C-alpha cells in the first residue's frame, strides 16, 4: 500500500488536472491561465508550479492524462475473443468512454488546441492516429494471425466503427450544447454494429 502522503499527492494532482481540463473546455486556450486555474482551486498561483511551469505544460499534461484514461477503457478481459465480437465490443467501448463526464471535455479541448501550437497537434496526432492504430492492431492481432482477416482490413474495420459512433457522440456531447443522446441513439448503435457485421461478411466472401 502506498504511503498516505503519496496517495494524497496523487489525488491532489488529479484534482488539479480535472480543474484545468474544465477551465480549458470552458474558456479555450486563449482564455485559460494559471491565475484562473489557481482561483478555481482556491490556491496560490505559485503552488501550481509544483505541477507545471507554463500554460503549455498544463495543456500537455491534461492531454496526456485524459488520453491515457481513454486507452484504459478496454481492459484485457474485455477484448473480443472472436472476430464476430469485434463490432459490438468496439462500439460499446466507445459509448462507455463517452459516459465519463471528463471525456467529452477532453475531446473538446483536444480539438480546440490541436491547431494552436504545433506541439499540441503533434501530441494529438500521436494519440489519435499512431497510438490508436497500434491499439487496434494489438486487439485484432489474433484474428489476423489466424488468417480470418487481412491486417489492413482489420484496422480499417475498427476505425470505421469508431468514427461512425464517435462522430455521433461528438455531435451529442461535444460540438453543440451537451445533451443526452436522442431516442434514435440505441437504434443507431445497433445499425453501426450490424454494418460492421455486414462488412465482415463481405470481406469473408472476398476471401472465399
Briefly describe each language-model feature range:
Residues 122, 126, 130, 141-194, ...:
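Hydrophobic/aromatic-rich alpha-helical bundle segments in the mid-to-C-terminal region
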Residues 19, 23, 93, 164-168:
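Amphipathic alpha-helical interface segments
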Residues 15, 19-57, 61:
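Helix-turn-helix
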Residues 53-57, 61, 98, 115, ...:
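Residues in soluble alpha-helical coiled-coils and helical-bundle/repeat scaffolds
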Residues 99-126, 170-175:
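Amphipathic alpha-helical segments used for helix-helix packing
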Residues 1-11, 22, 175, 204-208:
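N-terminal intrinsically disordered/low-complexity leader segments
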Residues 64-70:
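Short, basic, alpha-helical segments at the C-terminal edge of helix-turn-helix-like DNA-binding modules
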Residues 61, 74-107, 151-161, 186-189, ...:
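Hydrophobic alpha-helical connector segments
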